[in-house]
Amino acid sequence: MKSIKVCVVGEGGIGKTSMLLSYTSNSISNEYQPTVFDNYSTLLMHNKKPYNLSLWDTAGQEEFSKLRRLSYPQTDVFLLCFSLINPSSFSNILDSWVQELNENCPNTPIVLVGTQMDLKSNSVILDRLCEKKQLPISTQQGIELSKKINAFDFVECSALTQKNLHLVFEKAIDACEAHQKCQSKEKKKNNKKFKKNCIIM
């Protein structure tokens, strides 16, 4: 069985922990408590293959920055999250999060995830955003950002309704597998070049 380390990053309070709890245990906590560090594990079948996903939940707050970075080594794929109803969490993907990941794990694949999908049509949320002259993040905006940061894919999901929730983690596996295939091809290519340059005495 293949093991994959999935590290979940993004601003605090955008639903990262709820997403993981909903996926691993079908439960959601209504109380927000900042995560310092949490680890979940789950087994799943994808494309007729068994996988063991090690899910690392991290704190998004700046004060936990050093601690958060300790979770990064040996990560196979990042789920880089923002809230679809929090425009600042969206803009911070490009302003700070991509830079942090590139500094620490420049070659690790990323799946961009928009959380709290169910709240995009919530009238209270829409009124609150309207007061600030803001709108929820559109699917097209997510796709465009995904391309800009060279992410493997973009997925919108809801921890509450579980819409697209399983797709998030399937995409994480796909990203990891695609990256490893690419690395393997590159290695074979380099080996061929090395053999061509070798002179037998």
UniProtKB/Swiss-Prot annotation:
Xref: SUPFAM superfamilies: P-loop containing nucleoside triphosphate hydrolases
Record key words, sorted: Cell membrane, GTP-binding, Lipoprotein, Membrane, Methylation, Nucleotide-binding, Prenylation
Listed GO MF terms: GTP binding; GTPase activity; protein kinase binding
Modified residues (Cysteine methyl ester): 198
InterPro entries: P-loop_NTPase, Small_GTP-bd, Small_GTPase, Small_GTPase_Rho
Propeptide: 199-201
A GO BP entry: establishment or maintenance of cell polarity
Motif Effector region positions after renumbering to this chain: 32-40
GO cellular component, one term: phagocytic cup lip
Keyword Nucleotide-binding on entry: yes
Binding site for GTP: 10-17, 57-61, 115-118
One family name in Pfam for this protein: Ras
CDD domains in UniProt: Rho
Disulfide pattern: none
Organism superkingdom: Eukaryota
Membrane topology annotation: Lipid-anchor
Location within or outside the cell: Cell membrane
Entry annotated with the keyword Membrane: yes
PANTHER family per the UniProt record, alphabetical: RHO FAMILY GTPASE
Family indicated by similarity: Belongs to the small GTPase superfamily. Rho family.
Official protein name in the record: Rho-related protein racG
